[in-house]
Regions:
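Nucleotide-sugar donor-binding catalytic core of glycosyltransferases
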Residues: 2-169
Length: 170
C-alpha cells in the first residue's frame, strides 16, 4: 500500500498506527513514525483544477486527455493580474495569505482581480487565470517540495506565476 500525503501537517496529522499500514509513504515533508526506507520525499502530485468545471459537483474537465490540453491555444491576455483565494483562516499561512491579498488589492486597486468562493466565485479556475498576464499563487504553507494545483493552474493558463510557497522552488 502507498499513502500520498496531500495536506500540510497543520491541517492533517497521521497517527503512527495509521502510517504503519503503508509500505511506502510519499510526502513533501518527513513524517515521524515512518521508517526511512519507506519514506519518499516528493511533491504530492495533486491534479490541476484549470479547465475543470465544479459547479455541478461532478468536476467535469473541458479536456478529455493531456493531448487536448496541450493543443489548447494560448488565450488572449486582456487583464494584468489575478489571484484565486479562499477565506480559510485555520492556519497562520492561511491568515497571512488573506492579509497579503488585502494589501495587494489596496495597493494595486482595479489592476488586481480577486477570485474565490467568498470573493468573486468562478465555476472553473480557467476563467480566473486565462485572461491574465500574471497570476498570484499563494500556497497554504511554506514547506519544501509542497506545491499544489495553484501553481500548475497558472502554468496551464499561460499566466506568469507570482509565487509564494515552497522555498526550494526557484
Amino acid at each position: 500500500r502507498i499513502l500520498f500525503v496531500t495536506e500540510p501537517p497543520e491541517i492533517k496529522k497521521y497517527p503512527r498506527s495509521y502510517l504503519g499500514q503503508f509500505g511506502t509513504v510519499v510526502s513533501p515533508y518527513d513524517l515521524r513514525g515512518v521508517e526511512r526506507r519507506s519514506m519518499v520525499i516528493s511533491n504530492p502530485c495533486l491534479s490541476w483544477h484549470y479547465g475543470v468545471e465544479r459547479s455541478s459537483g461532478r468536476n467535469i474537465s473541458k479536456f478529455s486527455n493531456l493531448n487536448e490540453l496541450r493543443a489548447f491555444p494560448m488565450p488572449e491576455k486582456t487583464g494584468l493580474i489575478s489571484v484565486v483565494c479562499s477565506t480559510k483562516t485555520a492556519t497562520s499561512a492561511q491568515r497571512a495569505r488573506l492579509a497579503l491579498v488585502s494589501m495587494l488589492k489596496e495597493r494595486l486597486g482595479d489592476a488586481l482581480h480577486v477570485y474565490g468562493r467568498e470573493f468573486n466565485p468562478v465555476d472553473d479556475k480557467m476563467s480566473a487565470i486565462a485572461p491574465y498576464k500574471y497570476h498570484v499563487v499563494l500556497e497554504n504553507n511554506y514547506l519544501d517540495n509542497f506545491w499544489t494545483e495553484k501553481l500548475s493552474d497558472a502554468w496551464l493558463g499561460w499566466a506568469l506565476p507570482l509565487y509564494l510557497g515552497a522555498p526550494n522552488l526557484g
